[in-house]
Amino acid sequence: MFRTLKQPGAWVITLAAAGILMVTMGARQSLGLFVSPLDSSTGLGVVAISLAMAVGQFAWGAIQPLAGAVADRYGPGRVLFGGLLLLALGSAMTPFMDSTSGLIVSLGLFSAIGSGAGSFSVLIGASSQRLPLAARAAASGVINAGGSFGQFVFAPLLQALIQLFGWMAAMWSLAAITLAATPLVRVLAKPLAPPPPQAVADVGLWHSVQAAVGDRSYQLLNLGFFSCGFHIAFLVTHLPGEVALCGLPSAVASWALAIIGLANVFGSLYAGSCVARYRSKYVLFWMYASRALMIVFYLLAPKTDLTFYVFAAGLGFTWLATVPPTAAIVGKLFGVRYLGTLFGMTLLAHQIGGFFGAYLGGLALTRFGDYGWMWYADIALAAAAALVNLPIREAALPHAAG
């Protein structure tokens, strides 16, 4: 798998993108650790905080097509640099917010838009445009693993900071770490080499978007990714609450999130390898089907520390490993010239699901006292996602660019 990255500069580009994603995704995927401290500090309630987090899920996805389009048109450097600055600003502002609207601004808008601008659509799009075809699948897996490794590092780190110094200091530390990642942007800001003369003529961004929106395979891919966003956002936001309902210490939640991240490092690398060998739609089918089975296992198992850790490892293996095969299908259908934009649109579908997963989780807890109905919805959506991927066509359209 890694042999394809031995070409000059391939590892530098790949690791720079992975490093940026480690910070932006590590920050986003660990926000659930702040729900209880925010509730205790502000008295706003879980529903209000869940709403701010849900707005953040949607904003993170909504910025993806726009950030991808700007990066495709003008280059990724300014987009990534601005995103990191905005993420740092949102994190630094949050301790000063004591209202629902304030949290929506800091966490739901600034932090979410900033991390979204420094996330998959821009990073995978920029790296794919700068790497040869043979290296793209492996690079996608490594970049995705960087995001998962961020969750593995950030979850226990932020939990320790919360316990030792309080949640406000943890937020300010997050802002400082984000700023420290800005030098990596320079690697991806370098201009693209001119395309070879025999390359397919560029049909333009708008024409590519129109073709994607009307393509049945692209529509089915987005439906599956909606389900992915639903349960990832639900777990990221409400896993600490589920752990508390089971009478277990908060450290179980932070370590479960860390295990999810660590397992997905291996899952992402394996997904990148599978994309290079098998049809991506079958990779996605088995990933989504396994999630439904893992949730059934969790519901039937006794609620102990070990159960949460096994559940986290099993679910974590496919957590964000859906990104390489999903991005690969978009690239196969439409080429890589506007991959940042078109994959960004797919990520928007993911985060619309994320909005419902984060918000409905808080609503279910308030209304029913537990997350039972959310788990059942999660099983149904994961099974549906597995099935809708099977009819997808993995063949380039005639006008695919790049």
Language-model segments: residues:
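Helix-to-loop junctions at the C-terminal end of transmembrane segments
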Residues: 63-75, 268-279, 365-366
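Hydrophobic core of transmembrane alpha-helices in multi-pass small-molecule transporters
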Residues: 90, 102-118, 226, 307-321
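Extracytoplasmic gate region of multi-pass secondary transporters
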Residues: 31-35, 216-268
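C-terminal ends and interior cores of transmembrane alpha-helices
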Residues: 85-98, 290-303
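Flexible cytoplasmic inter-helical loops of multi-pass small-molecule transporters
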Residues: 187-207, 398-402
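Residue-level signature of mid-helix packing/kink "hotspots" within the transmembrane helices
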Residues: 29, 57-65, 152, 261-269, ...
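Helix-loop-helix hairpin linking two adjacent transmembrane segments in secondary transporters
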Residues: 143-190
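Cytoplasmic helix-loop-helix junction between adjacent transmembrane helices
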Residues: 107-145, 335
